[in-house]
C-alpha cells in the first residue's frame, strides 16, 4: 500500500484561512506557469485529495481524472467538482490506465508519503504522453520547520514525511527516463510572519529557477516511443492471414512517431 488512507493528504483545513488561500494561490500560479495546460488536454491528478488541484485544470477546460485509494475522498471530490469529473479508486504505484493515456500527470505532495517514490514516478511517466508535474516540499527552504510546513500544506503532523531536495528529484527523473530538459521553480520563500506585513516581497522574486521556496515544482517532458491508440478505428477493415498487411493508421503511425 503506497498511501495511508486515513492520513495521507487530509482535507486542508488551513485553506479556509486567508493565509491558507494565499499559499494555494501561489502554488496555483507556479503550476500553471510550469505546466501551461491547454483546453481539451487530459489530466490525471494522482492522489487527488480534496480536488483543489483538479479544479485548477478544470478551470482551463481540461478533461480531468483523479485517483485515490480512499472511496471517501473520491466521493468528496466528485461532490465538489461535479459528475463530469472522472474519479478512479487505485494506487499510485499501480495506475489502472493504459500507456501514454494522459497529456498531463501531476504528482503534488505525493512522493513525500510514498513508500516507493521511484515506482510512483515510473507509473506516472508510463501513463503520460506529454508532461509530468512534480510538486514537493523543499528540504532546503528557510520558510519554516518541517512540522510547520506540514501544517501549512495540510499534511498529517503525526506521519513521517520525506522532504526532498531538488537534485534528488532530478536524479530520480533521470534514473527513470534518462537525461531530459526539466523546467522548475518554487514559491513561498519566507516564514509565515513575513507575509502579514510584506506580502509584496514574495511576488517580487521570480518563480522559475528559484531554489528558495517551500513548495518546489518541476515539469518533465515525456516522449513516447510507441503511442497506444486511445481512439477507435472509424472505418471497418477486413483482416485475414493472406492479406499480410496492417490495418491503416496503426503501424504506420507508430513508425512516424519514432522518426520524429
Question: Predicted segments — roles?
Answer:
Residues 1-38, 52, 73, 131-156, 160:
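Conserved class I S-adenosyl-L-methionine
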Residues 118-132:
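A short glycine-rich, Lys/Arg-flanked "PGG" loop and its adjoining helix->strand segment in the class I
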Residues 160-184, 216:
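Short alpha-helix
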Residues 109-112:
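Short catalytic micro-motifs in class I SAM-dependent methyltransferases
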Residues 44, 49-94:
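Class I SAM-dependent methyltransferase SAM/SAH-binding core
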